[in-house]
Amino acid sequence: MFHMKETPAEAPLREALRLLEGTGLAVALGGSGLLGALGLAESARDWDLTTEADADRVAAALGGLPLERNGPDGIHTDHRIRIAGGVVEILCGFSIRAPRGVVRVPTIVSARVEGVPLGSPEAWAAAYALLGREEKFERLMSWLAVRGADPLVVSRLRAEPLPETLSARLASLPRLLAAPSGPA
């Protein structure tokens, strides 16, 4: 998928998407899968999906698939559901504890590639900054600096209790002038 050199099996990702979207849930691929789709990574160790639906609704939508549930821990204040032995991790209500409060990272579909809904690069840049993953944060910020950022997504993120430096970096991105044509 996405022309990456190394990825986990795609079948569990596609099955999760089929089941979740089939019940009307909005979901989006983030993490290394998103980076790979944007040409910013050559491998992914798992598929990270986000949704704003709660964990009970997600579990019900997965229709009896074997799953593992994890609640808030450490910096994560969300709930996570893992399927296929962790090949797919679904972050339900993706949120991260930050110095100024809990930051809710929205699930926004920015494009579809090979039938897979891609998450917002702006939202994942903010998430990576909050998670202390500086290299991935900078890759996404560089990508956004060239292509432009969706001003509505940036505004939504800046309404969260972000650290001032992160809020300022997001605000400094050039605005996306046209509708995105895809991840390239």
Residue ranges of model-derived segments:
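Compositionally biased terminal segments of proteins
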Residues: M1-A184
